[in-house]
Structures are given as structure tokens and as C-alpha cells.
């Protein structure tokens, strides 16, 4: 990758996903837009409700209702052709602001063994953190989030989640123990554990080592993607990347590294 480390966050914040959205009641009238990979679909709901003049609260891709995840992570999970064709309809409403801040608190706890850094922040600063995501404003986000990453405490673990898409029962998928479990189309499971940023001999923990520790059957080698690889922000993640550096440069705005398994 030719992008320098210092510009990786800016590049990620600038990345967009083009969308082609229709309402179930008006399939021939699309709403065309592009949204940041770090944004959330629910932020479009007021505009969509006004555009379609109909209640809008849930998003569907090929009849699968999408979860309340960052757009970039959803794109990694479903690997759609672009523009991504979605259908919006009425359904369960999302409270993404509270969900986002709760995820930030959880990431803070994982990093240091407590959530003191985020809990000590003022209401004004936590509001600014969320507003920076709404506005896709990396500069404003960095001013607040840097305080969480450069806390006067020992960094213990990297907030890390591994998403494993399930193989539909009729897809003829691999039935070996290393393959993702069969399930409904579009479903997935999440593997999450406390992953130290340092090895027992005080060397930086690498992504491949963490994957092998978490799922040795699926990742028998810590050096090479023998049976499976993982995607982060639309590209294959290198197994030799230090987790601590990845956390600082390539985590989602809520502080989590979110990898999607590709078999």
C-alpha cells in the first residue's frame, strides 16, 4: 500500500459507498447518493422519508434486513456490486447515537481494562465525537478520539471483532470444521475475545497471530491465509500488521477493528 501511515485515517474517512435506494412501494423511483464508509444508513432516514413520502426505518439487501452497522462494514460483509442497490421500508427504528457511544465505551474498556477515559469526558465532548461521525469530519473526530488512544494508562488489548458470514444451507458450502456454519442467507456470527497488543515476550502482536489464537482451525498459519483471509475496509488485511498500529490507524470511529472472513 502506497498510502503513508499518517494519511490512512484520512483516506478511510474519505472513502464512499455509492447507493441506489428504492422504497418497497416505489421500486421504479430510486434515491441515488453516496455515503462515507464510516457513516450509518440510519442517518439517511429523514431524507428518505421525505423523498418517498412514506415511513422509512429499515434497509434490505436481497431480502435480508441489514443490521445497524457502519456502511463500510456492511459492504465488506455482503460484497455487493456498486452502486449498492438497497430497499427501504418501515420497520423497527434505530437509535444509532446511543448504540455508537456504547460501542465507544466498550472499546475503551477493552483497551485499558476500564472505561475511565470515555467516562471522564464531558457530555459536550462525547456529543462532539458523535457529531463528527454524522458530519464525516475527521479533524473534529481526531481531536476528541486522540484522548482515548493516548490515555495515561497501559494499553492492554486491541478492540477486535471478526465477522464470519454463514453459508446458506442450499449454497453447497464446505462442511468441514473450518468452514462457517450454515445459516440463513445474509447471516453471520461474530468472534470476539480479549486480544493482547503484545506477545508474552513483549513483541507487538501481529494480526495473523491473533487470528490463529482466536480460530486455529480456520487460520492454521499465523503468517499466511491458508484457508481464509480477512477483509478490512474493502481490502485484504496483511497478517504481518501489528494490531496496536492497526487499532490506531484503521479502526472504525467507535474504536473497533472489524474484520470479515473470506474463505
Predicted regions and their residues:
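Ubiquitin system architectures
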Residues: 1-34, 41-263
Amino acid at each position: 500500500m502506497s498510502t503513508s501511515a499518517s494519511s490512512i485515517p484520512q483516506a478511510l474517512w474519505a472513502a464512499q459507498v455509492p447507493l441506489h435506494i428504492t422504497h418497497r412501494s416505489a421500486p421504479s423511483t430510486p434515491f441515488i447518493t453516496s455515503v462515507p464508509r464510516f457513516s450509518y444508513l440510519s442517518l439517511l432516514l429523514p431524507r428518505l422519508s421525505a423523498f418517498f413520502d412514506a415511513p422509512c426505518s429499515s434497509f434490505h439487501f436481497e431480502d435480508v434486513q441489514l443490521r445497524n452497522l457502519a456502511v463500510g462494514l456492511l459492504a465488506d460483509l455482503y460484497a455487493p456490486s456498486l452502486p449498492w442497490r438497497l430497499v427501504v421500508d418501515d420497520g423497527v427504528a434505530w437509535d444509532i447515537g446511543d448504540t455508537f457511544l456504547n460501542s465507544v465505551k466498550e472499546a475503551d474498556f477493552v483497551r485499558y481494562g476500564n472505561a475511565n477515559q470515555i467516562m471522564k469526558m464531558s457530555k459536550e465532548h462525547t456529543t462532539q465525537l458523535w457529531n463528527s461521525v454524522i458530519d464525516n469530519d475527521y479533524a473534529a473526530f481526531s481531536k476528541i478520539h486522540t484522548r482515548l488512544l493516548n490515555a495515561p494508562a497501559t494499553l492492554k488489548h486491541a478492540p477486535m471483532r471478526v465477522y464470519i458470514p454463514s453459508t446458506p444451507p442450499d449454497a453447497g458450502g464446505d462442511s468441514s470444521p473450518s468452514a462457517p456454519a450454515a445459516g440463513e442467507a445474509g447471516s453471520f456470527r461474530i468472534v470476539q475475545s480479549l486480544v493482547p497488543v503484545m506477545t508474552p515476550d513483549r513483541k507487538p502482536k501481529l494480526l495473523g497471530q491473533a487470528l490463529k489464537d482466536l480460530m486455529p482451525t480456520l487460520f492454521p498459519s499465523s503468517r499466511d491465509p491458508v484457508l481464509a483471509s480477512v477483509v478490512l475496509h474493502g481490502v485484504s488485511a496483511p497478517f504481518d500488521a501489528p494490531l496496536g498500529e492497526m487499532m490506531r490507524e484503521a479502526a472504525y470511529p467507535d474504536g473497533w477493528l472489524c474484520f470479515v472472513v473470506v474463505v
